[in-house]
Regions:
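Sec/Tat signal peptide C-region and signal peptidase I cleavage site
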Residues: 15-19
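Subset of outer-membrane beta-barrel
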Residues: 20-430
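Sec-dependent N-terminal signal peptides
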Residues: 4-13
Length: 430
């Protein structure tokens, strides 16, 4: 029997309808039950403030790690570092059940260094996906209840997939930049399913789990073509990136054991470690463009495609789930009144806005899961001109109240600290 999707998305110690609140690390969403969890929006507050665009963004003040080719747009003596975090506030509704949760997550740690003339190095850490869910449902079959008593089914999960990367980029001529990243995917995904019996038997709970250890290497290639026009007043940039798809290697540990009323294990039903983890991170293609007036404004658009349909995931009891191709369209704009104004601080602030539409890789109960939203952001100069506090807010919605789905509305706050310093400058005076 198919169950309404996550109809019992509530705290384990609560029951009935009404609003529930949860605090968590990483994420806490029913949709992270599927696949490798909730795919994190990539990019710093600079990118998110503009709807998430970055494929064709070139900026000598901030790090754009969405395209490795972009890091050649920099002062040849500059050291740059970007550290970010985010806070998510999600509000879920499923028929008459409402829930809310807050989650905190490290967003990125990225460093870029000059190498030689118009070439540069980039290295960093970025979360790719997060799992966080916890919900319960009772047994409703009267024959089973009459024989075994009240039974509750619990599902809960946690974990993440992250990437470490190192890359380089260089300019070829005056209008083309190319870059490459070497990527190490790693992490562990924990997915548990428990059955709890209310009868006073030796066995009170059967605990089952699947632990997925992620370990894989991949690569990402990027290019940007940029050319001035209209008497060099404006700059047109075309960008593209491609990430190689890879099996996420590692081990799968399947286990099941029984516990008594005190939680002590009384019997191991099975325990198996399989080194053939076939979960796959598919290839990703992204293209985009920007039109920019230097130090004044920029508009742009990105499109991203990822072929998740070729990836198979373990089934989810009671819910039809399959992976499908994901698409996203993002648009954004930024504006700086006068970045060199010495009298009025807010004229030096960069203001951003954007929007996006995403069709997720999740297809649940025969329906594609989509999300859309608007974003706002700004860069607040700190001390020196290129040091800044970057802020962004993402207001969106995914899912719906139709077809036994969960409607999820969210507000995500992102903060990044950008450090920009000059190295190897010989002082004029000792």
């Amino acid at each position: 029997m198919k169950l309404p999707l996550l109809a019992f998305f509530i705290l384990l110690l609560s029951s009935g309808a009404g609003a529930q609140t949860v605090d968590a690390l990483g994420t806490f969403t029913p949709y992270s039950l599927f696949g490798i969890g909730e795919i994190e929006k990539q990019g710093s507050a600079m990118n998110i403030g503009m709807g998430g665009i970055g494929v064709a963004v070139r900026n000598n003040r901030f790090i754009n790690y969405l395209n490795p080719a972009s890091i050649t747009e920099r002062d040849t003596l500059s050291f740059m570092m970007d550290v970010g975090m985010d806070i998510k506030n999600f509000y879920n509704k499923d028929n008459d059940v409402s829930s809310a949760y807050n989650a905190f997550n490290m967003r990125n740690i990225v460093i870029t260094l000059p190498i030689y003339k118009k070439s540069a190095l980039i290295l960093g850490f970025v979360p790719i996906s997060n799992i966080g869910y916890k919900f319960a449902s009772p047994e409703t079959d009267p024959l089973i209840v009459s024989k075994y008593g009240d039974i509750k089914y619990y599902k809960y999960g946690s974990g993440s997939v992250n990437k470490l990367f190192v890359g380089g980029a260089l300019n070829i001529g005056k209008k083309l930049a190319v870059g490459v990243e070497l990527i190490d995917y790693f992490g562990t995904l924990y997915k548990h399913s428990d059955v709890e019996f209310s009868s006073d038997n030796t066995i009170r709970t059967i605990v089952s789990g699947n632990d997925y250890t992620i370990s894989a290497f991949s690569a990402k290639f990027g290019a940007q073509f940029f050319t001035p026009f209209a008497n060099d007043k404006y700059l047109l940039t075309l960008g593209a990136t491609y990430s190689i798809g890879r099996d996420l290697g590692g081990d799968i540990t399947d286990y099941s054991y029984a516990t008594d009323a005190t939680g002590i294990s009384v019997d191991t039903l099975y325990h198996n470690v399989n080194s053939n983890n076939t979960i796959k991170m598919p290839g990703e293609l992204a293209v985009g463009f920007t039109i920019k007036r230097q130090n004044k404004w920029m508009v742009g658009m990105d499109y991203t495609y990822q072929a998740w349909k070729s990836t198979s995931f373990p089934p989810v009891r009671g819910v039809d789930f399959e992976a499908t191709a994901s698409h996203s369209l993002k648009v954004g704009v930024e504006y700086t009144p006068n970045m060199y104004d010495v009298r009025y601080y807010f004229k030096r602030v960069t203001y951003r806005a954007g929007g996006y539409y995403e069709k997720s890789y999740m297809k649940v109960n025969g329906k594609n899961l989509s999300a859309y939203g608007i974003t706002l952001g700004c860069s607040l100069p700190i001390s020196r001109l290129n040091n800044a506090l970057n802020l962004a807010v993402d207001l969106g919605e995914r899912g719906s109240l139709k077809d036994n789905m969960v409607r999820e509305r969210y507000v995500q706050f992102i903060i990044n600290v950008n450090i920009h310093d000059l190295w190897f400058i010989k002082p004029k005076y000792d």
